[in-house]
Amino acid sequence: EGDFEEQQTETKEISDREKYDGRDDGIVTPVKDQGDTNLCWAYSSIAAAESSILKSGIDSTVTKDTLSLNPMAAAYRVFKRESDPLGNTDGDWQSVNYLMQSGDPLKIAKLYSMWWAPVSGNVVTTNPYENPSYRFENAIYIPENKSNPEEYIRSIKKAIAKYGAVTFQYNNARETLYYNPKNEHSSTLSPHACTIIGW
């Protein structure tokens, strides 16, 4: 019970700060380059997972410089799950170029909730059941709160303070080289995902 109260106090203390940066606490891993893939959603999810692992202290053998989960392997398994150990997902294979598929962080949360674990290393086809780096236990969803943006921001700060990072998606409708309002017609899609590590 003491650990819970201590964590609650720390979460409140951090979320009440005028500014916070998880890098100052050593819980943010180096930025990974998604290259020319559409996998920002996988990269942002893995970055948040890495920060959560470091924040929680569940693995004393890793640091921000040594912890490196594979976002491409996570994206690969979203589209090419194959069979789970119980045979419940036999035939779950999509013949798509997973590197170019859009997605959202919720896809990773759903995948990991089915015990498809994150993996380390560079091999995207690594079996996540036989070679898990960690196991997913929970995810927190913060619904958008347009009627009370201050409370929405407070919820995000509390989640960062408690877990280390959050992911989000946005639809950038301003006109730039890569984002252009002529091409973004107020769709329900959010074409980019990022990780927030502070404020």
Model regions: which residues?
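Catalytic-core signature of thiol
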Residues: 1-199
